[in-house]
Amino acid sequence: MNGVLIPHTPIAVDFWSLRRAGTARLFFLSHMHSDHTVGLSSTWARPLYCSPITAHLLHRHLQVSKQWIQALEVGESHVLPLDEIGQETMTVTLLDANHCPGSVMFLFEGYFGTILYTGDFRYTPSMLKEPALTLGKQIHTLYLDNTNCNPALVLPSRQEAAHQIVQLIRKHPQHNIKIGLYSLGKESLLEQLALEFQTWVVLSPRRLELVQLLGLADVFTVEEKAGRIHAVDHMEICHSNMLRWNQTHPTIAILPTSRKIHSSHPDIHVIPYSDHSSYSELRAFVAALKPCQVVPIVSRRPCGGFQDSLSPRISVPLIPDSVQQYMSSSSRKPSLLWLLERRLKRPRTQGVVFESPEESADQSQADRDSKKAKKEKLSPWPADLEKQPSHHPLRIKKQLFPDLYSKEWNKAVPFCESQKRVTMLTAPLGFSVHLRSTDEEFISQKTREEIGLGSPLVPMGDDDGGPEATGNQSAWMGHGSPLSHSSKGTPLLATEFRGLALKYLLTPVNFFQAGYSSRRFDQQVEKYHKPC
């Protein structure tokens, strides 16, 4: 993760772990690349500041709610409060980072001095002409993109790298061109190639939506055969795909990146086209700004050689009292409220999840025997039911048809079937169900004859949810045990009621009222009637 918590401030940039955010209260996103959005998801519930393009992509692709996204115009200064009473404020200015669509640098100004966070950026001399950087401001801390901060790594400019790609394509006039890209970035390169070779560039629907948002030239399509230049995911550029593509049409692949990649096929070409500043560009940028200190953004990479370009360091700023209260309160009260809000908004699990009939049909006989032995080992014998309570996750005393006036009607009842956890609105399979006489009115005579039901079941036993209410589990599971036991006041379910219970558990109430049958449910019944 490439993000920072700026010390002695409530500011966090590209940092989305609330557990480690401490006193951070203001969150900023530089761009939408995945290494800068680790921990950011649809559950995010705090104000977040970014550029308008990033705001659109953030809501579109990560489903972050719009109520938390604050889009700030690029090139303009914005005043934000640093406490709860508006006594202390700071100014933040967004500058184009020349990295990918929507990427920006953040210039923070406040009691802490002046801080510039570059994020990922590709330096150009025109950046020094930004009004926010030309007013003689002293940069106290420069958070620098040090991805390519290595004197041994020499990179061409993007114009030079683009020229190399054009020359390579010209050497293969009859070939299809596969250009491997990440999910965001290098759209301007694709536009340049399309205009250079007067051909359509084939994109995925997702990237096409992006280029339309950027307002680029109308040179992109999703039709596979419309043009010979195809933008694909960089992971698709591999040896096996090269063989497959060349079987139908001569194809070369281009990876525009500064990373060291071993080419697994002679037609895969790596061109050092980078959206990160080269070492020489970083040196020029730091020398022009003369910050008091340089802090690398990518902690795993080296970042040195700037000592001769630094200004004298200043002392640690004093945090105003109102800001201290603002920062300390953010680590306690909001976190508790945020957790409560998330719990209240959590969707209630409803419905039934069944095991796939195809999966059950594909089980081997050995697996079924193993499950049968396990059930026999775990299931108590009828004679033991009086001596020990049921240890099944549920001890249910529930009507076959739910009481519409009961408060429990909307509650999901968890149960386990075939070692899979599911939820159900009625009593689970493998348990006797306590029927009441009022249930009989739901069952028509035609339905009784269809499922082989004789006389109605007479309810007996206690109504207090004790051990008697659990019934005879062995009789339901079909282990050949007697269908009754010595416990007094326990409802007895004969063999013919197995089809009834299964059908009613798997079938909604309106199914019986309609008076028709379902082949899928019959298959479920046949499966459970088959001997193990």
Curated annotation (Swiss-Prot):
BP term (GO), one: interstrand cross-link repair
Motif position, TBM: 496-511
Record keywords: Chromosome, Cytoplasm, Cytoskeleton, Disease variant, DNA damage, DNA repair, Dyskeratosis congenita, Exonuclease, Hydrolase, Isopeptide bond, Nuclease, Nucleus, Telomere, Ubl conjugation
CDD domains: apollo_TRF2_binding (cd11662), SNM1A-1C-like_MBL-fold (cd16273)
Regulation: Beta-lactamase activity is inhibited by sulbactam.
Molecular function (Gene Ontology), one example: damaged DNA binding
Main location class: nucleus
Consequence when changing residue 35 to N: In Apm2; abolishes exonuclease activity and function on telomere maintenance. In Apm1; abolishes exonuclease activity and function on telomere maintenance
Region (Disordered): 350-392, 453-482
Subcellular localization: Chromosome, Telomere; Nucleus; Cytoplasm, Cytoskeleton, Microtubule organizing center, Centrosome
Effect of substituting residue 508 to A: Abolishes interaction with TERF2
Catalytic activity, reaction form: a beta-lactam + H2O = a substituted beta-amino acid
Outcome when changing residue 142 to F: In DKCB8; decreased interaction with TERF2
Entry PTM: Ubiquitinated, leading to its degradation. Interaction with TERF2 protects it from ubiquitination.
Disease as annotated in the protein's UniProt record: Dyskeratosis congenita, autosomal recessive, 8: A form of dyskeratosis congenita, a rare multisystem disorder caused by defective telomere maintenance. It is characterized by progressive bone marrow failure, and the clinical triad of reticulated skin hyperpigmentation, nail dystrophy, and mucosal leukoplakia. Common but variable features include premature graying, aplastic anemia, low platelets, osteoporosis, pulmonary fibrosis, and liver fibrosis among others. Early mortality is often associated with bone marrow failure, infections, fatal pulmonary complications, or malignancy.
Function: 5'-3' exonuclease that plays a central role in telomere maintenance and protection during S-phase. Participates in the protection of telomeres against non-homologous end-joining (NHEJ)-mediated repair, thereby ensuring that telomeres do not fuse.
Family membership noted in the UniProt record: Belongs to the DNA repair metallo-beta-lactamase (DRMBL) family.
Name of the protein this chain belongs to: 5' exonuclease Apollo
Biological source species: Homo sapiens (Human)
